[in-house]
């Protein structure tokens, strides 16, 4: 039995995700597809537009056999930690291969970049320092240093974006690899695989359609998640029917999941953020909240802002939108740096929580129970009896975050979904 794993957000599930899932099965010849999906919050430091149970159902309807949850401590982490959790979890449950999308589409090129970043040469470190001293952001300086140190004889074959048969001795081509979000995440998967000595095979496919951050329908066949979220937000403000909106832009196979769907947006958390800022102290040890950002947050005079407005007010050249958004979300959730450090030190993947699975895929569950090296949670009410204290704390952080999400969601007309009583999603 061969199992392929996909590390995802599905925010929301769109045509590009369906293509990814289909190609992953074909490329690996896998018998089963396991999806590891962010829960209530995503890496950008925002709430998922739809709840985790709805998004689980869309994945299963599209062909996934099993959906597991990335807990909020790592679903809202940096690319490095997000990737490390995904690789650790899929390795721990016995997945054989991982397939991810990338702008590059060439696994060997991404492996070379990953190796270079895991084994930084003295020249790389010096060029990185020079870039930072010159005023570049860390991602910009890192991309430039990679380009300047990796340029040389490797060739990229049959990659449209990199021009087939282009000699990548050109440093700009190497730099561009680290300027593309899916390449960056793919490189982090490969770095984590080396660090964790993962036995899994890794494959990449060229990302189809609009770019990750494209917020318009540049490609009607493969619109980006960002564009779809924008359409939903803008259309709802004009009192358009949600199901009509979704039917035009999401795979038909997933449409049944959206009956009664209630979208959630980052500004729905504005009240919680304002209340937290009012009572916070600059000495809080909150994940991703630097002393500089904490000081700016607490500097008088206080004025209530929407979540989006506060991000815009705080971001700088060095503090990107996503970095600020992630820090503010961690502040609202009370997510402490010391807790995340402990969970990382203990191996990231302390349990595997099932969100849903296909009934016809029961042999997969039997296989995972045999191959799995960490507790497998199928019933939340029983989790406390099977988890070590640290693992239970990781799960309880997810429960707290999801209940906050649900509290906000019911204000938009949703039904509260309790983490301890909500059943698994079956298809």
Predicted regions, residues:
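N-terminal catalytic cores of NTP/NDP-binding nucleotidyl/phosphoryl-transfer enzymes
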Residues: 1-55
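Short, contiguous strand/loop micro-motifs
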Residues: 8, 42-43, 59, 73-74, ...
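Non-catalytic positions within long, well-ordered alpha-helices that form the structural scaffold/packing
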Residues: 25-26, 60, 87-91
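A broad structural signal for alpha-helix termini and local helix breaks/kinks
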Residues: 28, 63, 194-197
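Receiver (REC) domain switch/active-site residues of two-component response regulators
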Residues: 31, 65, 96
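Short, solvent-exposed amphipathic alpha-helices that sit
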Residues: 54-58, 189
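A glycine-rich helix N-cap at a beta->alpha junction
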Residues: 57-71
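Active-site cores that bind ATP or allylic diphosphates and position pyrophosphate for catalysis
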Residues: 69-427
């Amino acid at each position: 039995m061969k199992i392929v794993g996909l590390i995802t957000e599905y925010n929301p599930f769109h045509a590009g995700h369906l293509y990814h899932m289909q190609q992953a099965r074909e490329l690996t010849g896998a018998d089963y597809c396991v999806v590891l999906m962010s829960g209530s919050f995503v890496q950008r430091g925002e709430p998922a537009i739809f709840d985790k149970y709805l998004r689980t159902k869309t994945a299963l309807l599209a062909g996934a056999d099993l959906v597991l949850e990335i807990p909020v401590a790592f679903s809202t982490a940096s690319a490095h930690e997000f990737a490390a959790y995904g690789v650790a979890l899929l390795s721990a449950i016995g997945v054989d291969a991982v397939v991810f999308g990338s702008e590059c589409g060439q696994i060997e090129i991404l492996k070379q970049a990953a190796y270079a970043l895991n084994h930084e040469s003295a020249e790389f470190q010096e060029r990185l320092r020079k870039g930072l001293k010159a005023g570049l952001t860390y991602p910009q300086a890192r991309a430039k240093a990679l380009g300047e140190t990796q340029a040389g004889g490797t060739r990229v074959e049959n990659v449209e974006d990199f021009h087939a048969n282009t000699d990548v001795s050109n440093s700009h081509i190497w730099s561009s690899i680290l300027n593309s979000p899916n390449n960056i995440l793919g490189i982090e998967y490969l770095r984590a695989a080396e660090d964790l000595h993962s036995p899994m095979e890794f494959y990449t496919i060229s990302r189809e359609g609009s770019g990750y951050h494209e917020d318009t329908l540049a490609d009607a066949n493969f619109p980006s998640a960002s564009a779809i979220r924008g359409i939903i937000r803008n259309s709802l403000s004009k009192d358009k029917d949600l199901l009509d909106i979704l039917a035009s832009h999401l795979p038909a196979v997933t449409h049944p999941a959206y009956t009664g769907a209630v979208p959630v947006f980052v500004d729905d958390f504005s009240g919680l953020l304002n209340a937290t800022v009012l009572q916070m102290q600059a000495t809080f040890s909150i994940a991703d909240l630097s002393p500089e950002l904490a000081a700016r947050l607490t500097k008088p005079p206080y004025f209530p802002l929407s979540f989006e407005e506060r991000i815009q007010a705080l971001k700088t050249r060095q503090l990107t939108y996503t970095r600020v958004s992630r820090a503010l979300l961690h502040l609202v959730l009370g997510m402490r740096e010391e807790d995340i450090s402990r969970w990382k030190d203990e191996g990231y993947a302390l349990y595997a929580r099932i969100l849903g699975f296909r009934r016809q895929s029961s042999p997969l569950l039997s296989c995972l129970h045999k191959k799995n090296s960490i507790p497998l949670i199928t019933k939340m009410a029983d989790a406390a009896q099977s988890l070590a204290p640290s693992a239970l704390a990781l799960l309880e952080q997810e429960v707290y975050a999801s209940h906050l999400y649900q509290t906000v969601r019911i204000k938009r007309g949703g039904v509260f979904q309790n983490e301890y009583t909500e059943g698994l999603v079956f298809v």
